[in-house]
Amino acid sequence: NKNFLARFRGWIQAAATLLTNIHIPNLFKGKIYQGNVKTMCVPGLNCYSCPAATGACPIGAFQAVVGSSKFKFTYYITGFFILLGVLLGRFICGFLCPFGWFQDLLHKIPGKKLSTAKLKPLRYLKYVILVVFVILLPAFVTNSLGMGDPFFCKYICPQGVLEGAIPLALANSGIRAALGHLFTFKFTILALFIILSILFYRPFCKWICPLGAIYSLFNKVSFLKIQVDHEKCVGCQKCSRVCKMDVNVVDTPNHPECIRCGECMKACPTDAICYHYGFSTKKQAENKN
């Protein structure tokens, strides 16, 4: 079935989260896995300090290199971003990111849901955060040894608290005793995004995530795309109405905000929307106008 990925998305997200955090026993031991695999980056936003983490967070790894006193252009991590971006684009956000799945689960909690359609300008904030907190501040705000802090991880990222600080503190009395104002500040950010995720769909992905900002740059050229068959399309706009990322699916199926979740495919009454594999866009006709 052409919509196989969309139909089994929840299971794929669960499997991806498990593979990204395969060392489950470490959660109870309060120890961080530091084996050879930890030098490799995982696709989604997943804290290095999570005791169960299989690999490194690409954003954290990038900041570590940028903030190093012996800074060199990080060919490995930059190449990692480009490779995954060119192959999948923001499919990673929709299917492979643990924090994205966490927000999806929160949004399933029954209650009033709010639209982000009128908040579209906030989507550009994640690009500002990418440039300022992931690149510029770690590179140029340094200590006496010439080393910069991982500003995004340290001061913004809620995933670090959820996966790293909280499990480690629960398992280690020494860490609990050392928690201070920074933890309180970060925990407040996490709590805020938990509340926002119940009300809005994926607020962190839309407005804050620098990893999503990077992958979004490749959405229009990636190997995996969304394809609209305009000969089948009847212009009902059901696809755009169900899109929780506020994308006009018919006009811009591969918009930078599209996370390839497939909800538009399930809503289409004529099966005019499907995944398209390949770099060629010949089959992906533009709209009739």
Model-identified regions with their sequence ranges:
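Non-ligating segments of multi-cofactor redox enzymes
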Residues: N1-V250, P256-N289
